[in-house]
Amino acid sequence: MTDPIARHPRGILVACAVPWDDDERFLEPLFRQQVRALVADGFPQQYVFGTAGEGHAVDTPRFRAVTTAFLDEAAAAGADVMVGVIGLSTPAIVERLAIAHDLGARAFQISLPAWGRLADAEVDRFFDDVCGTFPDSRFLHYNLGRTGRMLTGADYARLVARIPNLVATKQATGSQAHAEDVLRLSPELAHHFDVDLFPAAALHGPASLLASYAPLSPRRIHDLWDAAERGDAAALARMQAGIVALSADLWSTPAPGPHMDGAYDKLLLRIGVMPGFPLRLLSPYQGFTEDDAVRCRALMEAKHPDWLPA
């Protein structure tokens, strides 16, 4: 399913988590292995430094080191990658983007500054100043509630008219009505929806998939995408019900705690395609524990073995 007015091809987008040792040093060989493994599993569209990749927590030396390794390994593995930047102001975001741009990146993921909710004029100025600084690059907007403002279809329609290199979005949260709204009012953009919303979103238009469960079960993610490509509403409904049940079981298993997105992604890697992946997050954020990983793996083997890698 393609759209002749789309600025960016649809596809499956997958996050790369960043492994740290006990002293919070970058484990580059393991990170490179992850990039290669995702490509081998059929996921060449990858990004780093969203919330899952700890873009909110990383300092500049780590940002530079990870970005350098990411771009180098992507080129060798044939991955189509983007680098995320999270910051509290336009100058801070542009500064980080410039580092990645100098290293060779030409596709970026950005989110609104989160210190205060932006008004319409401030949203427009942010995209003008950020995207306009790098006219040779493509931008995906990471739309999430913790920025204080979720952009709507009308917001995106306004931005499409003024920002030619805004090509995609990542809709981390939202309802089915929100999915229909952004797909209908801004079809020029490739809108990526996470696994829990994608089955419903795909019934409203040419949705892309943000595959947070890809490290757990590449096969099931490809099945989900294939059902959407066929327009198989019955299969999508069954799969959505299965995803809801899986998520309820899996995320009620670990001990409770204030876990950031990266904690979940690292746990999925650990119990999925990369059993040795470390669970640590950069300070001050709390990751899952080794006991959590053991319990979650046992839960998957007992109740959802069809979601585990072959």
Ranges and model annotations:
Residues V48, G84, I110, A211, ...:
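Residue-level detector of family-conserved "landmark" positions at structurally sensitive sites
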Residues L13-A17, D41-G42, G205, R220-A310:
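C-terminal alpha-helical cap/extension of soluble enzyme domains
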Residues V66, F126, L159, L236-M239, ...:
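A structural signal for short hydrophobic/aromatic patches embedded in well-ordered alpha helices
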Residues L38, A100, A201, L268-L269:
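Hydrophobic alpha-helix position signal
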Residues R7-R10, P215, H259:
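Alpha-helix N-cap/helix-start motif at coil-to-helix transitions, marked by capping-box chemistry
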Residues T2-R149, R158, Y285:
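Active-site beta->alpha loop and helix N-cap motifs at the rims of alpha/beta catalytic domains
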Residues C131-S137, L144-P254:
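Catalytic alpha/beta core domains of metabolic enzymes, predominantly
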Residues T67, I93, A179, P218-I221, ...:
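A general structural signal for well-ordered alpha-helical segments in protein cores
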